Amino acid sequence: MPMASGDESMSARSENPVQSARFDEATVLHELEHYLPKQAPLKDFVHHNTLHAFQDSKFHDAARNASGIFGYNLSLKLDKYRDLYHRGEITPAVLDWVVRRHKGDQSDLWKTKVVAGSFAPPPLPRIGAVRANWKKNLRIDLDSLVHPLLFRILCSYLDQGISMWTFPSGGEGFLCAIRELERHSFTSFFRRERARRLLLEQDCSIAGLLKLLVRDEALFERYLFDQQFAHPGWSGMVTVIEAQPDTLIDSRRIGLRELIVFELLLEIDALDEHFDEQWSPLEAELGGEPLDILAEVPRTELHDALAIWQEALEWSFYDPVLSAIQRQPAESPALPVKSFQGLFCIDDRICSFRRHIESLDPHCETYGTPGFFGVEFYFKPENAKSHTKVCPGSIEPRYLIKETGSRDRLEAEPHFSKHSHDLLGGWVISQTLGFWSAVKLFDSILKPSASPLGASSFRHMDRASSLTILNRSPDDREDGLQIGFSVAEMAERAENLLGSIGLTQDFAPIVYVVGHGASNTNNPHYAAYDCGACSGRPGSVNARVICFMLNHPEVRAILAGKGIEIPAATQFVGALHDTTRDEIAFYDEDSLSPDSRARHRANAAVFDKALALNAKERSRRFELTDSQQSPERVHEAVKARAVSLFEPRPELNHATNALCIVGRRFLSRKLFLDRRSFLNSYDYRVDPDGRFLLGILRAAAPVCGGINLEYFFSHVDNQKLGAGSKLPHNVMGLIGVANGNDGDLRPGLPSQMIEVHHPVRMMIVVEHFPAVVLNTIRQQPATWEWFANEWLNLTVVDPETHELFRFRDGIFEPYRALTERLEVAADLEKLFETQADNLPVLALS
């Protein structure tokens, strides 16, 4: 995201590498909040650009600065790129093209350098350099003395349900709660009196504590950056909760300033204990003028070489895809008879599902659109204490949809009883049910099955429940939100949805709207598997809501007045696709007419067969699944692994995502894209000025771009920007995961989610005229930034000439694909049975 007003850009900081000695607490706190991770608690996990703080810079400049400042590894290793080149995954023609574009007349010299040259290693990162002098000069490791206690206190204070006893917060905030405990407890958090006394002084300030620890005001900013980036997970979580307190169901008040004050007190106490209060401030151990930690990082030949290799890797994938899209024949005439139409999420995991449906029923049509289906609201399940957002995180809804008449009840599980945590109850249960749990555990190894331990997207909403979709009075409100939508509001959203995908005529008798979610067991990152366009929730409620709107007679009358005539016999049916188990559930089937019910039974059989084929295609990535069995048998194995307690990879989620196509289906319908592409339906003919396109790109850039970049950065640096392996993870307070009991929270994605991913930035391909697309992205600064700063690549396909234009340096320039031949997929099923790695783009016969 662009820096907020008042932020200093990297270029501005580079002109003043040495900061003024004056310490501005508010400015430093603002900068810390800007650069710390922005991952929300687990229940609200949504993919985002991990380097959001640098998004106002060009991608390669941002990578250079972020790695030089914070020590992130933001590309593959040089040897890895060279290995990919020698294996043919980076093609020589593409590498030559990229080197010429970067180095011009020096391209021959630089081709030799990148392929076989050596480069000076990068300097050590700036972060941690000042604070490291405690260990270097005074032989004391403050992190090992302070972090275990600090993390336990933070986890206890922010706990959302693991602990039996709640932290006595008093509702006044973190530091107030700590002070209350100090005043009224028999023991203390501190070992010496000085830190305790400082805490109990109500005017305890960051500057005052830093005077004791560091003394030199010119070092204060560097010290705080070093301190907070020694545990960016916890610090980032605190900034998220401070900015969005509603993200916690059990509300807690905490801010970064409070965290820093308490940590500084713990550091003073550790030094007092270690040196018996006879120690000098850090200033005495340092020499020389401090360098501004956020100053521009000098560019080196190694940076240039890595940028060249990265673009060569990306264009080795882009070029054959663009060539294949350009070669697609003109759109076929409309089908005279349509069996059904289906609206699906643009999600890359749905790409293959749509392909299988279309191959089984050539008379159907499928469309892709962001999986909230254009209806933005909060959803409140029956008997729930709070509501949840089910639309893109950047949207602030004004509407609430409530569930009523739910028949679902959570299955009782005696092991979840609170009595198991009591002294007496715990002993009794362990001696009785404990033996039975061992038997169940052993049985689950041999025969995995669904249990209350698992998370299932089908539980998000009861199929038999009712939803308060129609608002009958503007005064019908709850928590400041309007309950339901008026008829006019419903018609507006219905028009926008249908117009954005180009479905404004020739409706089939049944139109399915299929959201998606996931199911998994023993997986803290469950929200990452659901729909990103629904803020990490399943799209089931959204599917039912938009179907209600499109079936409403008054809405249809308004649409007809705007040229969208939906036949009276056409019915919209909501559904949910579980992408882990490849299962589907349909909603409100009892509202179908007799004729539609017969059609629906036939269509449901097509969906079921497509799900089995989809499971078989997915299984080629699963080492322990025999992909050579029949689709039905493979499907059963895939469903079993989804509920296994011991399966760290229930599905590979968005791994290998690299592409988003915004255009008519004929551009991709005859292509095998290996589940790597988001597919957003769009017809330029109904949107000559780009009004609908603006809405599409405004959603696709942060949603698809956030997914792509989180996978990218979690892959290239899984230890700092990812979460490492799932195996040692412990869930901390139900808000995050950490290694062990005393570790920092691990933002980003675990290695099991990204190990098969190829780190390439997403290419968005739009079917429209270049001038229209350029004017469209210029209208929205946040959208423009994604493309102008090259966090996403953008190519336009001229719908009349099929010429390609790539976006670079603020303009579209012609692009001529290097790939001259497209392979044909003779037998896809054979490929699924024998190949586990990425497959090239193929033409479908």
From Swiss-Prot:
Its main location: membrane. GO terms for molecular function: zinc ion binding. Transmembrane segments: none annotated. Zn(2+) binds at residues 345, 347, 516, 531. Its cofactor is Zn(2+). It is a peripheral membrane protein. Forms a complex with DabB. The keyword Membrane applies. InterPro entries: DabA (IPR018752). It is found in: Cell inner membrane. Belongs to the inorganic carbon transporter (TC 9.A.2) DabA family. Residues 1-20 are annotated as: Disordered. This is Probable inorganic carbon transporter subunit DabA. GO terms for cellular component: plasma membrane. Part of an energy-coupled inorganic carbon pump. It comes from Azotobacter vinelandii (strain DJ / ATCC BAA-1303). Keywords: Cell inner membrane, Cell membrane, Membrane, Metal-binding, Transport, Zinc. Coiled coil: none annotated. It holds the Pfam family DabA.
